[in-house]
Amino acid sequence: MRNFDAGAPVIIGVGEASRKTVAGEWPAPRDFAAAAIKAALDDTGQPQAVAVAIDTIAAIRTFEDSGVSLGTGSPDNTPEAFGAAGGVTAKRLIYADVGGQSPQAMVNELAGDIKRGTCEMALVVGAEATGTAKRARKAGVTLDWRLASDTEFDNRLSSFPILSRTEIRHGIISMPLAYSLIENARRMALQLDGDAYAQQMAALWSAFSIKAETSNHAQFPGFRSPEALQSYDNGNY
């Protein structure tokens, strides 16, 4: 291939993990992280060589460490714990900041590091087990997902408040409320009325549901037509 940039960052493996748990099973986030990491390593075709070459692990901050605690506790060093569970160690450990932007932000940042030559190979991993925590709470089971560590890591937790006084004053105190404002701002920018915008969004999400129809990891498996997504029937919410 001509004009190939040998320093260009390339994603060489991806992995996903989920499971339907049964009574008596209480998998922690690091259990799911382990399965996802192993799947990603296998996806590279050279799992052992890649695992050894990884010098950076970036873990996406869990809900437990984002101010939405379910009382399970968490490892002192989540990137280290997730990596170790998947058989990977690294000299550089990053625990990403709060927010849904973190997965893509970490991919972007580490791609830049690879391009600049400050990172050879990186692993980005995130895992949650909120279903386990909720089942345990209902069953009266106490879970302890803490794991001691004194290893240093880059803790990206910001000190800025997630909500401003203006947002609180106007009742914008949850993400769904903020999202609805953003969607309406987008609708106005596109000069669409409510019905036209709903049709456009229903068509978009119907296309996503084609993937959900065949995915083993889909929370709501099955195809949903645009008409079904615009209705208020059959559990649509």
Regions inferred by a protein language model and the residue ranges of each:
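Conserved "HGTGT" condensation-loop signature of ketosynthase/thiolase-family condensing enzymes
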Residues: 1-96, 112-119, 123-237
